[in-house]
Amino acid sequence: KGICVKLGYDHALSACFDPLSLSYRAVWDGWVRFEPFRWGCSRGANIEGNPWFTLNKAEMPEDGNYLGFHRFGKRVVFEYEIGKTRIQDEPWATKNTFFRRIDLLNQSEKITLPCKLTDEAIKVSFIETKGIEDIRWENGEIIAEGIQKKAYFIVRISKESAHSDEAHAIAHLKSERKLQKRWNEILKVPGKLGKPAGTSRYAIDTLTVPYDNPYKTVMQLTSLAFLPNGNALVATLPGDIWLVKGIDQDLKNVTWQRYATGFNQPIGIHVDEDGVFVLDRGQIYLLHDRNGDEEVDHYEKYANDFGSYDRSHTHTFGLHRTADKAFHFIQRTDIFRTDRDRTTQKIASGVRNCMGVGGTDDYFWAAPQEGTWTPTSAILEVVRGEEYGLAGKNISAPLCFIPRGVDNSTGGMLEVTSDKWGPFMGSHIGLSYGSGTHYLILRDATSIRPQGAVVP
């Protein structure tokens, strides 16, 4: 779940912040490297460069709670709580020094922050304090006492004495944080209108994907959702969310622009009256654009009490929300539910490479792939406490199996809610990952356990 950040104007150092311990688990000169296996997405990232320090283990402080992070141009500010004190923590660096500006947003008698180091040659000092009676570093912790509202301090962490270039870094940390647009490029990528085949009344339009883009990002698309104004949000496996505009009657003025980035393999977007939600391997985010410039500047943690694994053939798939405001998603072989109080529970298990997600306000569907203990791909109507085959015990029946001639690797499932679909309104469309086709899903709920079928 670590969040890696490039620090300094010229990428002087990198740091990895751990939301599960509210600490920096590594600082190094360099960046990260991904293994080539499965496009680099089935193994964890590795440090590439020379570490200053790494922490193999770190614990969450008592009453600690990670809240998310903010973007101010190149500046990243992590936000969390320890007890009743809300804290903002901004890392920065020069070539020889790692800095943290820590803002204590409310009054407190005493606060203890993690600041563990593994190299005795690295020294900790405080070069700027405001609204704090006493501050010290001891036994891997920063201890501040007599804290006034909106107090702050700047920590200097280095093996060396102060260099002349540090004055610029300190001035940067003391300066006002301003919301700034980071990606000004708007890519015009016209779409293509489809034509009905034969006597069909249905056509398939095409939105062209900007594979050649200024950020050199790989456009492996994973999920999409529509905003109330008709614009779309599209996620990519490497970690971007794109805003797609101009989806109208002729598709001549379709544009793509970067909306958010930095996710760990996002494969789930949900939009409703509560906001824009994104699921990645270790967290559900609630995204905020605070200044209306069509870029996300506040990445709020909605829930992160699940997941965190460094290797897998499969991923984390979602994100379906039922009428009770609960989110449903799949991670590895298990099915999870995050309730409106933002707590997550495993509710079912035994699914194999289960990337298919769908359902309605009243139920949740999951679609595993054929293979071990899964005789053929299937659609499951998930019931709490059930097992669905991969463990080889107590196998519960699916809504339906999908014959191999129809689909060999299921994708998502979509409820048809528009009357423009004519007689298919209220039905479900299944999408094939394996063959790029689609089919109709039928559901009969007249018996004790719903049953279904697929129609190519």
Regions found by a protein language model. Give the residues of each.
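Extended acidic/polar, glycine-enriched regions
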Residues: 118-120, 126-184
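Generic recognition of long tandem-repeat/solenoid scaffolds
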Residues: 76-80, 100, 134-146, 276-278, ...
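Solvent-exposed residues in well-ordered beta-strands and their adjoining turns
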Residues: 81-83, 103-105, 116, 156-160, ...
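Beta-strand-rich N-terminal accessory domains
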Residues: 1-99, 116
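Surface-exposed beta-strand/loop patches in extracellular or lumenal glycoproteins
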Residues: 95-121
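A short, structured loop/turn motif at beta-sheet edges
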Residues: 71-73, 103-111, 147-148, 323
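Beta-propeller domains with acidic blade repeats across secreted/periplasmic ectodomains
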Residues: 170-456
